[in-house]
């Protein structure tokens, strides 16, 4: 009986520590989701602002090219639809989100150089990407099952971004900016979706459907 009473304080402390860790985890998730939502909104605004400077025929042609083309980050293996996203583990969604954010660290800098209309937003984006990357890394490190072996596809390096647009031709600058912004918007939407689902799972909500 005495041993039971001795164990009770230990169990209570353990319970409080566990609750504290869960609260901190949710706080980090809230911050990460808020950051990526803001990034997604900035990406949409930058794309819409640039799209608004194009002539109708130019816009249609670039949209057709983009639909047939691919983004540099497409080499990162990620869920292809809502169903696959729902089936993915929290840790897998965090790892994919981290790699997607990491893949934009250099390209976000090129936006500052390539289009003077977007300098202010691009500066915001570079800083917010760095903050979000740190936050996602904390979530990965603090995960209860933080060990996850990456398969060959996950561990592959992205192709050098500098070579991605080397064969665009005479209209390369306009097409380059269009594809950069369209891909950035697409990837921020992905990360927002993945982090929102991961946050919901960690909060133990009954319904985490997209």
UniProtKB/Swiss-Prot annotation:
Gene3D superfamilies: 1.20.1250.10. Its main location: secreted. PROSITE patterns: SOMATOTROPIN_1, SOMATOTROPIN_2. This is Somatotropin. It is found in: Secreted. GO terms for cellular component: extracellular space. Growth hormone plays an important role in growth control and is involved in the regulation of several anabolic processes. Implicated as an osmoregulatory substance important for seawater adaptation. Zn(2+) binds at residues 38, 192. One of its GO terms (molecular function) is growth hormone activity. Belongs to the somatotropin/prolactin family. Residues 1-22 form the signal peptide. InterPro entries: 4_helix_cytokine-like_core, Somatotropin, Somatotropin/Prolactin, Somatotropin_CS. The keyword Disulfide bond applies. GO terms for biological process: animal organ development; calcium ion homeostasis; growth hormone receptor signaling pathway; hyperosmotic salinity response; magnesium ion homeostasis; negative regulation of testosterone secretion; positive regulation of growth; positive regulation of phagocytosis. CDD domains: somatotropin_like (cd10285). Keywords: Disulfide bond, Hormone, Metal-binding, Secreted, Signal, Zinc. Disulfide bonds join 71-183, 200-208.
């Amino acid at each position: 009986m005495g041993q039971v009473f001795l164990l009770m304080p230990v169990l209570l402390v353990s319970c409080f520590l566990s609750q504290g860790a869960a609260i901190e985890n949710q706080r980090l998730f809230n911050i990460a989701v808020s950051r990526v939502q803001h990034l997604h909104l900035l990406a949409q605004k930058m794309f819409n602002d640039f799209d608004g400077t194009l002539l109708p025929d130019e816009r249609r042609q670039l949209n057709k090219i983009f639909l047939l083309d691919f983004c540099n980050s497409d080499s990162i293996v990620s869920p292809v639809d809502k169903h696959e996203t729902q089936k993915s583990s929290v840790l897998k969604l965090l790892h994919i989100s981290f790699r997607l954010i990491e893949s934009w660290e250099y390209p976000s800098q090129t936006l500052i150089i390539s289009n003077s209309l977007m300098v202010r937003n691009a500066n915001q984006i570079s800083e917010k990407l760095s903050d979000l990357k740190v936050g996602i890394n904390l979530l990965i490190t603090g995960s209860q099952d933080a060990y996850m072996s990456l398969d060959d596809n996950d561990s592959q390096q992205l192709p050098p971004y500098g070579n991605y647009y080397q064969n665009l031709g005479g209209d390369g600058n306009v097409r380059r900016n269009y594809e950069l912004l369209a891909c950035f918007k697409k990837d921020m939407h992905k990360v927002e979706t993945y982090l929102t689902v991961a946050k919901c799972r960690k909060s133990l909500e009954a319904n985490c459907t997209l």
